[in-house]
Amino acid sequence: MTHEPPSHPATELLPPPKPPLAFRVGIVGHRPNRLQAADMALLAGTLRGLLRAVQDEVMEVARSQAALFSNGLPVLRAVSPLAEGTDRLFAEQALALGWDLCCVMPFPQAEYEKDFVGEAAQEPDSLKRFRSILREAAQSGRLNCLQLDGVRTGGNDSDLYGTGGKGVLGLSDMLIVVWDGDTMQDKKGGTAETWVAARDAGVPVVAVDAKAPHHWPMPVVPGGLACLADVRQAVRDAMESKIKAPEPAATALLPAVRVLSEDATDLPAREVLDWRVLFPDRPPEVGP
């Protein structure tokens, strides 16, 4: 009796899953002590209009580049430290539009929350509002938190808050800056410094006047994104600069997607992967 050798299925290459299309907008701005000339309802509307313009353009890019990305809705993420004032107003508008929220805290949460109680607080029920925003995002599965390991020294903690601002910038494809134009009150690590860092990094910036009626770009700032059409074009430019055409996968990646034969024989690959990358697509997934 003769035995036929076992047959082996042909090697099958599985394409990697397509990434979601993603865009992230960060915020830096003033706390209530520098928003005394603001109309908060009007400022909220301005921020909401900017976010909606970004959202509309991302959806348009998703339609035009559908072959490159997963079939789900694009990921839209607001990046905010949730400090009192501008940060929270921005986050609330983003959540109302269905965006995800990434909260970048300059300290571990328990330490950061000390900014929102007692004499340190500048808003009524400040800690309650902070936690309420986090809870709203978490309950809908739209929250990421990045808690930095800043340690207060009892002196000037500007560098620690500045590190938080750099974290926001590093996780943002576009930055909205709400500034009052008063350079005399600017502090190290504050709004203006993060703005300069964004400019140096080539991140598109929308500069909104912290004073009513909240013009943008601010009258004191030449150039910049001057209208919603500019904002939408900046979104498209930022996204298209990160979309790579399909290219052969690295050899090291092939074993991860190759279906091996029953006896684990590593057959030569006869195809290349259809590999598409959008980078960066998501911030670190850190629990609240």
Q: What role is predicted for each listed range?
A:
Residues 2-244:
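Acidic/glycine-enriched connector segments
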Residues 39, 227, 245, 249-252, ...:
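Non-membrane alpha-helical secondary structure
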Residues 253-288:
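Basic, amphipathic N-terminal segments
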Residues 235-262:
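Charged, amphipathic alpha-helical linkers/stalks
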